[in-house]
Structure formats: structure tokens, C-alpha cells
Curated annotation (Swiss-Prot):
Gene name per UniProt: TPS2
Protein name listed in UniProt: Trehalose-phosphatase
Transmembrane segments: none
Function: Phosphatase catalytic subunit of the trehalose synthase complex that catalyzes the production of trehalose from glucose-6-phosphate and UDP-alpha-D-glucose in a two step process.
Taxonomic superkingdom: Eukaryota
High-level lineage: Eukaryota, Fungi, Dikarya, Ascomycota, Saccharomycotina
Native species: Zygosaccharomyces rouxii
Catalytic activity: alpha,alpha-trehalose 6-phosphate + H2O = alpha,alpha-trehalose + phosphate
């Protein structure tokens, strides 16, 4: 970013949790703030942006959830004899977490007064200041103070994280629980949007991190509707193939959330390709490849008329600080102590979180195979495995995994150990940083056997430490790295293994331990330069973002369509007497499906339409690209009080009428044979494609074809059709995974023009021209028009044109909202390019909105984004008031207890 004048570029850095933990003291009423563990690379990037070097150009604001707030517990003694004995016997270490949770049940620390919240916020900001000149009030906590604090992690950790790591955890009885966790996830993202709204200034860059905040980019687009708003998203975890991602029930909402960003980064190109594939298959988006500033491939995805550039940029580590922290006198003493404890033995080191994707079980099995295959190494090698407890501790799956690990450790030690020696030393705990760095220094080999992860910082840190010349002949000691780790695409000269093949891993261990010193050094000289630094990652991120933002400002209209104001819509609906509803069908009243014949109306849709149609003030028209037979079968036969228009306006059937009127009856239809033969040729070339032959229009569908192949042949087909259709006065229209040919003179807009400019409630005669001399009191005073694709833009354009005419002719007749009750509303993303005045996100929200009008849905259920208080309740709701009262009572009770 170029610093304009003396104003520094503001960056709002949104993290899932602040790099601090807030704890209530054990013996008094003081609040303690301690550094949080994990996400070391991300927090290093935050520190780097706060450094004097970067703070001259950037003003960083760190915004994040406080995390679970609990009571302070005494630190566990790590690496003591008690824990070592239990670990070596394969037993589980002490679980202080359980006792802590029991205490929290008795005394909830979450009832904070406003003064306490202000005080803790000031303490957090003091911790966030690295230089008073450059950082003033730059830490912004997101308060979500509710009992069962882990609820805010529920959807992210129990649904998203497993899916991103290729773990299917869905069960038949998880629906209601998952819905509740989804609502919490939405609230979590909305709380961030609210907090950002308090500090956002025009021109800010908003940098969003990882899967806790997938909805935030689009929420911010809708909230600010600022064309200069710049949003970047970085996904730190793996992104799975579409085969896995598509199992998520909320998959489209998640992708739509990310479409609000200007640019999205992933840890490697494979993850980026998976994301692009998911968008193409689930959002009907298009993509094109280009080269970024480094000459690497990037993708530009277009969906709903909005664009996002997708790139890969592996995160790095702070190499300078790591080496400074590692090579100290204190750690040198610990290194000597470890070497003395394992004199004459090769030391293999591993540190992994104990969960189902880090490969601890696979590593132990491979080590067991190694000892079996190479007896000469028995009593000569020790594996020190540190397994960090998972944040999701206590689940049945993790308990079984822990038991499995303990059984393997016991089995290996019994079979290959002795009274004086155990080949595996397993520590199930969080070890202090100095102990971890000591292990990196002393290791002869590090083994990373993860079955799925993003960037493994342990691997990067190990290689960096081994790049430093030391006194213990450890320079260049090798790294064995799983091919399923995202880091394998960075450290390409490491010993890459398949962790599921224990024999191959065993052979790699033997080879690594047998390397000569010269071979180790040659390997290190190749692999060390491949380690990315957090400084370079941060700089490259910001400079690349600058390029794409400049390009976006020059080439892309990023105006956001506001959400439909449903409370105002309901109020206007209740006061109006001549109401007209104009609905598209596919993608509006029903979701888009692979087979068009399968898009039948739901029972809920039929029920809502019946209730709307039963009101004599309402007139409802379905204006669809479907043919007459489909509309008759699924709508006309059930609801004769609906007006129907088929094939984008070629046919219509009035309310309570049986006969269809053909508006193209006098049009030359000889073109169909020639167009049909061309479509048949492309159908043969494209497996999964088919032709829908309507009475007037012909449509070539490729939704069931491979997306890349379908897009290619759709482009080729359009070129062929454009050549001949100009001679017949035909339109060649690109729809959602289809190409349609129909006469130019009929479209949905023409139908809408005749329906609106008409005596409300009277029989239609569309063969005659519209009656412009009608008084406005005879025409609709409430018109809701809903559609999702570009053919519906004709309807929106007509309504906008009608409103412009009415403003001139009937300027004294405007209603209390300053208009004429016309609501052109698109269905889709807020970033979609449209002439509509408002948007609803999907058919589900359409039904909720119509349900609101007929009393099936409450205003609260339909209202969309809401404001939350600090405990996650809707502001000013009954639950919010009760919570505030309980907080006051609790604070008073606590003060009295301390006085006593």
C-alpha cells in the first residue's frame, strides 16, 4: 500500500480469538490476562504489523472474540516424574479441565458489569501496545458472554473443521443440534460485523482469518454498501474437494459469505482449486485463470455478478525471533539435560495436537514397523512424542483416540523396551515453549505424519532451527513430512511420505537416520531457503491486495444491493388494497436443481400461495421460463386463482381461466429446426447435457455435465447460434447452466408492463397495448417482483421505468414511504449485479418473507441480521433484559461475598 501523505493505511485484522486469555483470579476478584497458545504464525504477523518498521505505514486494529472466560487454574507441572510415569505407562494425565468446568458451574465468571468490561478492555489494549507512539486503543474485543461459552465454537469446530479435514460426522439425529449451532455461528459473525461497524472508517482494509468467520465478508458488504470497502480473507485450514464440501447443509451460504471478499487466499494451490471447483458446482459461477504478480496461477470467480480473486500464499514463521529464542543459555542447558538422559541414542521428535488428522496413530505404527524391520536400531533410537490436548477434548472420538495411542505406546514399550529403557516417551500435555525449542534443537529427526492439515508450523520451525550451526552436530538433521500436509507443497525437498504406508515410512526413518553429515548438509541447504517468513507473507499479502483493489476500483462495480426491508414491506402490505405479486419460479420459489423436472413446488410453497391468493386484494402471477405443461401440472391445477406466464412471456393464462393465449402465434417458427440440429450436435459432444424443447423456445442444459466441459461447449454453442439467430430476430440467452433461444419481441418485462399498467383485478388482454391513460388509483399500489437470473432483469427494468414515469405523472400521489409501492427484488447475493432495488438471499428467505405477509412467520424469524448485546442476545429483547438484570444481581452478590 502506498502511504498517501501522512495518513497511515488502517487495517482491521479480524481473528477468531484475540491472542490473549482472560481469567478470573483464584483467590480474588482480579482479572488476569495471559497470552493464548496456538496460531503462532498469525499472531507473529500481528506483532510484525505492530512493529516500528511497519507501523510507519500501517495502523493496525486487532478485532476478535475474547474466547472462553474462566477461572485461573494453577499451571500444571510439565515434564515432571509423575506425568512422565503416567505417560510411559500409557495412562491419561490429570485432567484439570474437568475440575475447572465444575467450578465454573458453581460460580459463573461471565456476569460482568459495564465497568468490568471497560476495565478488561483497557488491560487488553495495554497488552496490545508494542509501541505507544504507533498503537493507541488498537485491540477491540468482541464480547459474547453467555453460559456454555463453547456454543460459539460449535458449528466451526464440530461441523466445519471435520469437513475441511475430510471427516464426515453427520448423523440422523444431529439436525436440530446442528441448526442451533448454525444460528450461533451466524450470531458470532454478526457480532463481528457490529463491532467492525463501530470502528470502521472509509478506506480501511478489513483482513479476515479462517473458518470461524466465513460469513463475515458478505455481512460487511451488506452492512456498509461502500464501493471503497476492501475485504481480504485468508483460509488457514485445508479446503476439501467438492465431493466432501458439498455434504455441508449450509454450503451455499458459506460460499456466498466468502463471495463478499475482494480476494481470498489459501495455503496452497490445491486448496484454491478445490474452492474454485466448489463455487463452480454449487453457485453456478464461472472462473478464469490468470497470472499473479509472481507469475503464479490465480483464479477470478464470477458468481451472482460479483467477482473474487482466489490465490495461494503459504503462511510463514518468524525465523529471526525463533532463532533468537532457541539459541539461549537456558535452552542450551535443557538440550544438554535431554542428551544426557538419552546418551548414545538417536532422538526422533514429534509434536502434534491429538486429534484424528494429525497422524499420531500412524506415526506410532510406522515407528513400531521400523523397530520390527530394523532390529539393529532397537535400543539405539527413542521417539519423544508430545501430543497436545485438543480444544474439543472430552468427545467420544477423542477419548477413543487417546486410548488407542496409549495402547500403542504400551505395546511398543513392552515389545521393544526393557526395565531401563522405553523406546517411546509420550507426553499428553501442552509443553512450555522452552521445552519445545529444546526438543527441536536436540532432535536427530522430526516426523510429521498428519493425514490432513494446512501449513504445519512445526515442520517449518524444525527446518529453521536445523539451519543454525550449533555445538551438537545437529545441523541439517532431516525432516520426514506427510504428503497430506499442506507444507509438503512448500518443503518439496523434505522426505515426503504417505503416513498410511507404515512400511514405506519405516524405510524413510531408516534412511534419514543413516544419512552422512555431508548428505544432511546438502539436504538442509536445499530445504532451508524454501521456508517462508511471516514478514514476507504479510508484505506480499498487503502488496498483492493493493494490486487487486486498484484493479477492482478501475474495472468492477462493487455496489451492494441492500437487503429487502421486511418490516417496512409488511407495514406497506397491510396498508395497501391493490396488491400484485410477480414471481419467477426456478431459483426464486424453489431451489435450482440438477434435473429441471425435479423442481416441484414444496408443500410449504403451495400453502403460502394459497393463503396469499385467498385475499381478494391480492393478484399473483408466476412468470417463468417453464413450459405450459409444467406450470399447469404443478401450479395451475392446484391453484387456479394464479395467473401464469410460460416460456418467458410467450404464453399466458389469466386468473381462473383454462385456456392459454399464445403471444407468438404469428411469428415464423422455422428457425427451430436449424437451432435444434445445432443443439443436438453439442449434446452429443457434452455428456450430461440435454435439450428442453418448448412450444416456442429451445433450451440447451448442461447443469449435469462436467462444469469445465459444459462451460467450454456452452461458449462454443453460443458462437454458432449467434451466427444464425440474427437472421431470425432471435435472442440467444445465457442462463444458469443453459443456453436458450427465443423470439426477441417477447420477454418477462413486456408481461410485467401489461400487468402493472392495468385495472387491478380485471381480466387481462395482453394482445392490446397497455392503457397509459389509466388513473393511478386503478393500478396496483403494492407490487412485489421476485426473480433470480438475468431474464428477470427485464422485469426489474420495467418496474424502474414505470416508477420514473409515475413520478412525473403522479408526483402528488406518492405514498408515505416516498414511492408507489414497487419492490423489484432479486434473489441471490448482495454483490450480484442487478437493477433491482433490494435482494433476498435464497428461496428459503423468499418463503420466509411471503410467510411473514400471511402470518406464518414472525417478524423476528424473518428479520435477518439483528443487533446483539455483549452476551449474544438480541438487543432489547426479553432475554437480553433478563440477562442484564441477572448480571447486576450477580455482581452485587459477588461484592457482598468479598466484603464478608
Amino acid at each position: 500500500m502506498v502511504n498517501s501523505g501522512h495518513r497511515r493505511q488502517r487495517i482491521i485484522n479480524c481473528v477468531a480469538q484475540l491472542p490473549y486469555k482472560i481469567q478470573l483470579g483464584e483467590t480474588n476478584d482480579e482479572w488476569n490476562i495471559v497470552p493464548a497458545t496456538g496460531s503462532s504464525s498469525l499472531y507473529s504477523s500481528i506483532e510484525y504489523l505492530n512493529s516500528e518498521e511497519k507501523a510507519k505505514d500501517y495502523e493496525q486494529h486487532v478485532l476478535g472474540w475474547t474466547g472462553e472466560i474462566g477461572r485461573e487454574s494453577l499451571p500444571s507441572r510439565l515434564f515432571n516424574s509423575k506425568n512422565r510415569d503416567k505417560s510411559e505407562n500409557g495412562e491419561k494425565g490429570e485432567n484439570d479441565l474437568h475440575a475447572k468446568e465444575e467450578r465454573e458451574k458453581e460460580e459463573d465468571p461471565l456476569y460482568l458489569t459495564n465497568d468490568q468490561i471497560d476495565g478488561i478492555t483497557k488491560d487488553l489494549r495495554r497488552h496490545g501496545k508494542s509501541d505507544d507512539h504507533y498503537n493507541v486503543d488498537n485491540v477491540h474485543p468482541v464480547w459474547l458472554l453467555r453460559r456454555d461459552q463453547k456454543r460459539w465454537r460449535g458449528f466451526a469446530e464440530n461441523v466445519l473443521w471435520p469437513t475441511f479435514h475430510y471427516i464426515l460426522k453427520f448423523s440422523s439425529d444431529s439436525g436440530e443440534k446442528e441448526n442451533l449451532s448454525w444460528y450461533d455461528y451466524v450470531r458470532f459473525n454478526e457480532a463481528y460485523a457490529m463491532k467492525i461497524g463501530e470502528i470502521y472508517e472509509k478506506g480501511d482494509i478489513i483482513w479476515i482469518h479462517d473458518y470461524y468467520l466465513l460469513l463475515l465478508p458478505q455481512l460487511l458488504r451488506m452492512k456498509f454498501n461502500d464501493q471503497d470497502l476492501t475485504i481480504a480473507y485468508f483460509h488457514h485450514s485445508p479446503w476439501p474437494s467438492n465431493e466432501y464440501f458439498r455434504v455441508l447443509p449450509r454450503r451455499k451460504q458459506i460460499l456466498d459469505g466468502l463471495m463478499g471478499a475482494d480476494r481470498g487466499w489459501f495455503q496452497n494451490e490445491g486448496f484454491a482449486r478445490h474452492f474454485v471447483s466448489s463455487c463452480k458446482r454449487l453457485l453456478d459461477s464461472t472462473s478464469r485463470k490468470s497470472k499473479n504478480r509472481l507469475g503464479m496461477e490465480q483464479y477470478q470467480i464470477s458468481a451472482y455478478g460479483g467477482d473474487i480473486v482466489v490465490d495461494s500464499l503459504p503462511i510463514g514463521i518468524n525465523r529471526v525471533k525463533l532463532l533468537e529464542d532457541t539459541f539461549t543459555k537456558d535452552i542450551a542447558q535443557k538440550v544438554l539435560a535431554i542428551k544426557d538422559a538419552f546418551q548414545g541414542k538417536k532422538i526422533i521428535v514429534g509434536r502434534d495436537r491429538l486429534d484424528s488428522v494429525r497422524g499420531v496413530v500412524q506415526k506410532l505404527r510406522a515407528f513400531e514397523t521400523f523397530l520390527s524391520m530394523y532390529p539393529e536400531w532397537r535400543d539405539q533410537v527413542v521417539l519423544i512424542q508430545v501430543s497436545v490436548p485438543s480444544m474439543k477434548g472430552g468427545t467420544n472420538q477423542l477419548i477413543r483416540l487417546e486410548q488407542q495411542v496409549n495402547e500403542l505406546v504400551t505395546s511398543i514399550n513392552m515389545q521393544y523396551g526393557s526395565l531401563n529403557f522405553s523406546p517411546v516417551h509420550h507426553y499428553y500435555m501442552r509443553i512450555p515453549k522452552d521445552v519445545y525449542l529444546s526438543l527441536l534443537r536436540v532432535a536427530d529427526l522430526c516426523v510429521i505424519a498428519s493425514v490432513r492439515d494446512g501449513t504445519n508450523t512445526t515442520a517449518l520451525e524444525y527446518v529453521t532451527v536445523k539451519s543454525h550451526m550449533s555445538n551438537y552436530n545437529c545441523y541439517g538433521n532431516p525432516l520426514i513430512l506427510s504428503e497430506f500436509s499442506g507444507t509438503s507443497t512448500i518443503l518439496k525437498d523434505a522426505m515426503i511420505i504417505n503416513p498410511w504406508d507404515s512400511v514405506a515410512v519405516a524405510k524413510s526413518i531408516n534412511r534419514a537416520l543413516s544419512l552422512s553429515r555431508d548428505e544432511k548438509r546438502a539436504l538442509e541447504d536445499k530445504i532451508w531457503p524454501q521456508v517462508p517468513t511471516i514478514q514476507k507473507w504479510t508484505d506480499q499479502f498487503l502488496s498483492t491486495l493493493s494490486d487487486i483493489v486498484d484493479e477492482a476500483h478501475n474495472t468492477t462495480d462493487r455496489k451492494m444491493t441492500p437487503a429487502l426491508n421486511r418490516p417496512a414491506l409488511l407495514e406497506h402490505y397491510r396498508q395497501s388494497k391493490r396488491r400484485l405479486f410477480l414471481f419467477d419460479y426456478d431459483g426464486t420459489l424453489t431451489p435450482i436443481v440438477q434435473d429441471p423436472a425435479a423442481a416441484i413446488p414444496s408443500a410449504r410453497l403451495i400453502s403460502i400461495l394459497q393463503k396469499l391468493a385467498s385475499d381478494p386484494c391480492n393478484q399473483i402471477w408466476i412468470i417463468s421460463g417453464r413450459d405450459q405443461a409444467f406450470l399447469n401440472k404443478w401450479l395451475g391445477s392446484r391453484l387456479p386463482q394464479l395467473g401464469l406466464s410460460a416460456e418467458h412471456g410467450c404464453f399466458y393464462k389469466d386468473v381462473d381461466e383454462e385456456n392459454w393465449i399464445n403471444l407468438t402465434e404469428k411469428f415464423d417458427m422455422s428457425w427451430q429446426e436449424k437451432v435444434g440440429s445445432i443443439m443436438e450436435e453439442f449434446t452429443r459432444r457434452t455428456p450430461g447435457s440435454f435439450i428442453e424443447r418448448k412450444k416456442v423456445a429451445l433450451t440447451w442444459h448442461y447443469r449435469r455435465a462436467d462444469p469445465e466441459l459444459g462451460e467450454f461447449y456452452a461458449s462454443e454453442l453460443k458462437k454458432e447460434l449467434d451466427k444464425i439467430c440474427a437472421d431470425y430476430d432471435l435472442d440467444v440467452m445465457e442462463g444458469k447452466a443453459n443456453i436458450e433461444v427465443r423470439p426477441k419481441f417477447v420477454n418477462k418485462g413486456e408481461i410485467v408492463k401489461r400487468l402493472v399498467w392495468h385495472h387491478h383485478g380485471r381480466r387481462q388482454d395482453m394482445l392490446n397495448t397497455k392503457k397509459e391513460e389509466l388513473p393511478i388509483s386503478e393500478m396496483p399500489d403494492f407490487t412485489l417482483c421476485l426473480g433470480d437470473d438475468f431474464t428477470d432483469e427485464d422485469m426489474f427494468n420495467q418496474l424502474n421505468d414505470i416508477e420514473a414515469v409515475w413520478k412525473k405523472q403522479y408526483e402528488d400521489e406518492v405514498n408515505q414511504w416516498g414511492g408507489f409501492g414497487l419492490y423489484p427484488c432479486t434473489v441471490g447475493s448482495a454483490s450480484k449485479k442487478t437493477v433491482a432495488k433490494a435482494h433476498l438471499t435464497d428461496p428459503q428467505q423468499v418463503l420466509d418473507t411471503l410467510g411473514l405477509l400471511v402470518g406464518d412467520v414472525s417478524l423476528f424469524q424473518s428479520a435477518g441480521t439483528v443487533e446483539l448485546d455483549s452476551r449474544g442476545h438480541v438487543k432489547h429483547s426479553d432475554s437480553s433484559i433478563r440477562s442484564e438484570q441477572a448480571s447486576a444481581r450477580y455482581a452485587m452478590k459477588r461484592q457482598q461475598s468479598y466484603k464478608n
